[in-house]
């Protein structure tokens, strides 16, 4: 009896080996016994939800982004030409009355003009000798000068009055995000534009998304391309900043593409300031795997995002046939967009080899079991 059991041991070992082969290749998650929430569109046909475009020179040319060109900004020029600073609460004013030093604000040897000037009070006024309170908030310097001159004329013959601002403290714009020195910037008598503010903030960091800068003005957001403004001289992207404006430079985390499939290094790649081409993406992934890839099946999957719903389409797919390496010319001209997926398909022979590699352990196990059974019978 013991001898028979010993003869069965190799057979049991073989069965264990075969059983192991059916379990090992990857984990599994079964939906049996779980609550599966059925969706109304569960029976969708994915093939009908995408458009496939084989890449041709003409199509690549059509998809090429329109280059930004230098152009003027006439409306901005008019805003700057007509710009006048209006005094706000907290500003410090200096009033000079020529030939009347007793009325002129003394700066003193160790005191700055901002320390000895006239403050614009929260009630919108400042005090001045002889004439008392002067309304200043919301007025330009010329309006304040005219008011003081007219009221001083009752006490001084032909007063010569000059008014300037010693400290701008009431109005600010805010620069935040991916700049080297974020913070508030004073609105002064010198017009402050978006380009001025970025330069005053020390420029952009390496993480900045300079194509999608957000300017919030009066509660409304505007998208500004600093790339077009700074690189191409498109002044239409420049804006005049007003009190309370917020200029935000976002991170470039969303500027990424995914390279998957039969490449040597599957990667998530960040796009730099100058964008990225299909050739660059494949190069950063160390190229396609020449032993397993199907060179005629290089796809760029581009989600339609907010454009979805046009005929129920969710993505456009662009196919590059790289069987002839000359087609890399088209790949070099094909510019990727954020969240594009570059997918390199597997060659049929590679799929067959992988299937064989999966089956070989099982085939070997069955053969071993058969040989073992024959050995048992021969005993």
Curated annotation (Swiss-Prot):
Compartments, record wording: Cell outer membrane
Leader peptide range in chain numbering: 1-20
GO cellular component terms listed in the entry, alphabetical order: cell outer membrane; pore complex
GO molecular function, a single term: porin activity
Annotated metabolic or biological route of this protein: Glycan metabolism; exopolysaccharide biosynthesis
Gene3D superfamilies reported for this sequence: 1.20.5.70, Outer membrane lipoprotein wza domain like, wza like domain
Lipid attachment in record (S-diacylglycerol cysteine): 21
Domain of life: Bacteria
Entry keyword set: Cell outer membrane, Exopolysaccharide synthesis, Ion transport, Lipoprotein, Membrane, Palmitate, Polysaccharide transport, Porin, Signal, Sugar transport, Transmembrane, Transmembrane beta strand, Transport
Keyword 4Fe-4S: no
A Pfam family of this chain: Wza_C
InterPro entries named among the record's database cross-references: Poly_export, Poly_export_N, SLBB_dom, Wza_C
Disulphide-bridged cysteine pairs: none
Residues where lipid is bound covalently (N-palmitoyl cysteine): 21
Chief location category: membrane
GO biological process: monoatomic ion transport; polysaccharide biosynthetic process
Keyword Transport: yes
Topology with respect to the bilayer: Multi-pass membrane protein
Known role: Probably involved in the export of the extracellular polysaccharide colanic acid from the cell to medium.
Annotated family: Belongs to the BexD/CtrA/VexA family.
Name of the protein in its database record: Putative polysaccharide export protein wza
């Amino acid at each position: 009896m013991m001898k028979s059991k010993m003869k069965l041991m190799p057979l049991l070992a073989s069965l264990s080996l075969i059983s192991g082969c059916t379990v090992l290749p990857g984990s599994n998650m079964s939906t049996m016994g779980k609550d599966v929430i059925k969706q109304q569109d569960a029976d969708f046909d994915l093939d009908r939800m995408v458009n496939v475009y084989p890449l041709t020179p003409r199509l690549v040319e059509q998809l090429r982004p329109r280059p930004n060109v230098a152009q003027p900004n006439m409306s901005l020029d008019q805003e700057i030409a007509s710009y006048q600073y209006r005094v706000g609460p907290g500003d410090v004013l200096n009033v000079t009355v020529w030939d009347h030093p007793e009325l002129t604000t003394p700066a003193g040897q160790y005191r700055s003009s901002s320390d000895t000037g006239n403050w614009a009070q929260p009630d919108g006024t400042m005090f001045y000798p002889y004439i008392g309170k002067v309304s200043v908030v919301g007025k330009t310097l010329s309006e304040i000068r005219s008011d003081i001159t007219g009221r001083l004329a009752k006490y001084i013959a032909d007063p010569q009055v000059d008014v300037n601002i010693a400290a701008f403290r009431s109005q600010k714009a805010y620069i935040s995000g991916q700049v080297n020195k974020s913070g508030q910037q004073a609105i002064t008598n010198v017009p402050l534009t978006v380009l001025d503010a970025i330069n005053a903030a020390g420029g952009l960091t390496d993480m900045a998304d300079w194509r999608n800068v957000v300017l919030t003005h009066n509660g409304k957001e505007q998208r500004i391309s600093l790339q077009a403004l700074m690189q191409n001289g498109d002044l239409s992207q420049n804006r005049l900043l007003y009190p309370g404006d917020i200029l935000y430079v976002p991170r470039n985390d969303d500027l990424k593409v995914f390279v998957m499939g039969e490449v040597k290094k599957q990667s998530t790649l960040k796009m730099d300031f100058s964008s990225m081409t299909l050739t660059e993406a494949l190069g950063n992934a160390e190229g396609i795997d020449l032993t397993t890839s199907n060179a005629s099946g290089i796809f760029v999957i581009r989600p339609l995002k907010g454009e979805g719903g046009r005929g129920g389409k969710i993505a456009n797919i662009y196919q590059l046939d790289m069987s002839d390496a000359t087609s890399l010319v088209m790949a070099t001209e094909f510019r990727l967009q954020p969240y594009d997926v570059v997918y390199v398909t597997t060659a049929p022979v590679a799929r067959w080899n992988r299937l064989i590699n999966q089956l070989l352990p099982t085939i070997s196990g069955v053969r071993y079991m058969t040989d073992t059974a024959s050995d048992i019978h021969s005993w």
